[in-house]
Amino acid sequence: MRELEEVIILRDELEAIKLHDYDGLEQTEAAKKMGISQPTFARTLDRVYKKIADGIINGKAIKISDDPNQITSTR
């Protein structure tokens, strides 16, 4: 079996996607729940969408992490 490269999704990115796409909240409402500005929320969504797309398109494992210093690795 080949080793998979990982895409790391941080907890705040997971929370953003949950609030917006799963719970159906508008960006302004979701940003308030997270205690961040709407522009920051929009950047977070953009970042996590790109990570998820990278994982799906390139066959990478998607890992959820609490560590913002963790980088993409090969497993």
Residue positions per predicted region:
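Residues within the DNA-recognition helix of helix-turn-helix
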Residues: 44-47
